[in-house]
Structure formats: C-alpha cells, structure tokens
C-alpha cells in the first residue's frame, strides 16, 4: 500500500446537532433536522470533544505506519451531510436552495464551521491532507453549486487549509477545467466520472487527480473484469510519463460491499506492474 486513510463515518457530526445515528445495516436516524437543532450554539470545544476519537485514531495509526507511508484524513462534505440530515439523500436534484433560509443557515452557519474545526483537528493530528467526500453535492443546480456553494467552501475551508484539501463530488462541475484545483486552493480532486480522465490528465498543471476505474467492474466475473481492466490500462498507457504526472490511480468512487477480493488484488497488481515497467 502507499497511503493509509482514516475512514470515519461521515455522518457522525450530525450527532452533535442532536440526531441519533444507528445502522440497520445502513445509516438510520431517529428523526431529521429541524429549526430547533440550529438554535443552540455548538462550541468548538464540544465539536472537538465529540470527535476526538478521530484524533486518537490518527495518532495511533501514524505511530504504526512506516515513515515512508502517508496518512490522510476524511470528512463528509457539508451538503452531503445535510442531505442525509434532512432525509433527502435519494433525491436526484434539489432546487430553490437560495430561497430556503433554513437550508442555507444549516449549511453556511452550522455545518461548514463545524467541519472546519474537524478538518483542523485531523490536520493537527498527523493527517497530511483531508479528503472532503461530498458525493451528494451533485444534487445541487450547477449555477448554485459554483457561485454559492463552492465559493463558500473556498472562502471558509479551502483557503484556510490551502493545499491540504482534496475534494470529491459525483459529476463535479469543477472537473471542466484542470486549473480549478489550484484556483480553489485544493491539493487535488477525485475524478468522479467514468470517462474523460485520460484527456483531463495531460492538462493538469498543479495538484493531483484521482480515479477513475468504475467500482462496479470489481463485481464482475474474472473474464469480464479483465476486459474492463485491459481497456482502462490501455487508455492511460498511451500517455507519456509526464502526462501521467499527478495521477493517483484508483476507483472513481469507493469500493462496493460485494466487490470480489480477487478482482481488487488483480487491479492493484496489474496497475503497479504495467506502470512500473513503463517508468523504467
């Protein structure tokens, strides 16, 4: 392996707002967020106290890792947290947010400041960077995502931890321009699309881009999986070493629960073998 990641469930911060989280087997809340949950001011001390297990886990992990292995942190994106907290995680698109004062207060006055504290805590406890996993931000209208939501994240999180945040959103509009990584002060982004990374990568000037093997391929029988893997490797083998610079080879999303372990191992071994040979 090359890097260890603190994979702490992204929904824990919602418990600080009064929701009770359970798993059956997926996440289930006893209720959803309401106005009363936003009225009580949550202090930095309370936020850090309720999430201090993350700092402890990071310190333990760092002490166990060899010095040549990296350690990165992990939080949920504010919109993704809110979509779960409102019980709206399965909706395709959510519109009219600029007219909904409750949603905007929850986002900008509560969740973003809360996540800023948690990110700082992780960075102060040996995380080299922190991934912001915001897959449900795809629910936002493109104009609102760029002009309102991302501007707020840029001003209140990305700029405060410049070069220390990696951002993931499914179908991320920022992937239209590789320069957005540096323009938003990010360390990198995850390429949450199935196609196009091999065209994006040669234009990358700063930071890293991660992806983008489709996770569902890992569920397939060996022969079908091998076809997909061959196609993936061929696409990136056509690029020069310089053009591949900044690429973190991975899936375009997380590993699915029923992924075949032999396919995961095969993916890692084939990718390393092929691209190590190309580097020689």
Regions found by a protein language model. Give the residues of each.
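Aromatic/hydrophobic pocket-lining residues that form the small-molecule binding cavity
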Residues: 51-54, 58, 108-111, 115, ...
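Active-site-proximal, glycine-rich beta->alpha crossover segments in alpha/beta enzymes
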Residues: 22-121
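Alpha-helix-loop-beta-strand connector modules within alpha/beta enzyme cores
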Residues: 30, 50-69, 142-165, 203-204, ...
């Amino acid at each position: 392996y090359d890097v260890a990641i603190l994979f702490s469930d992204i929904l824990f911060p919602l418990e600080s707002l009064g929701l009770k989280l359970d798993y059956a087997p997926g996440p289930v809340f006893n209720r959803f967020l309401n106005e009363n949950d936003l009225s009580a001011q949550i202090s930095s001390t309370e936020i850090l106290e309720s999430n201090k297990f993350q700092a402890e886990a990071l310190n333990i992990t760092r002490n166990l890792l060899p010095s040549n292995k990296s350690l990165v942190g992990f939080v949920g994106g504010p919109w993704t947290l809110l979509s779960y907290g409102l019980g709206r995680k399965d909706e395709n698109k959510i519109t009219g947010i600029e007219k909904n004062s409750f949603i905007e207060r929850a986002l900008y006055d509560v969740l973003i400041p809360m996540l800023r504290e948690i990110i700082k805590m992780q960075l102060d406890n040996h995380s080299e960077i922190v991934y912001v996993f915001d897959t449900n931000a795809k629910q936002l209208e493109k104009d609102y995502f760029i002009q309102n939501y991302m501007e707020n994240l840029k001003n209140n999180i990305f700029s405060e931890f410049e070069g220390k945040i990696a951002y993931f959103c499914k179908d991320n509009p920022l992937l239209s321009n590789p320069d957005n990584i540096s323009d938003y002060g990010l360390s990198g982004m995850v390429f949450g699309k199935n196609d196009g990374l091999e065209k994006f990568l040669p234009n990358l000037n700063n930071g890293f881009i991660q992806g983008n093997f489709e996770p569902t391929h890992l569920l397939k029988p060996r022969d079908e999986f091998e076809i997909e893997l061959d196609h993936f490797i061929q696409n990136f083998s056509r690029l020069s070493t310089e053009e591949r610079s900044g690429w973190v080879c991975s899936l375009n999303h997380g590993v699915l629960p029923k992924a075949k372990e032999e396919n995961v191992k095969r993916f890692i071994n084939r990718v390393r073998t092929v691209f190590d040979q190309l580097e020689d």
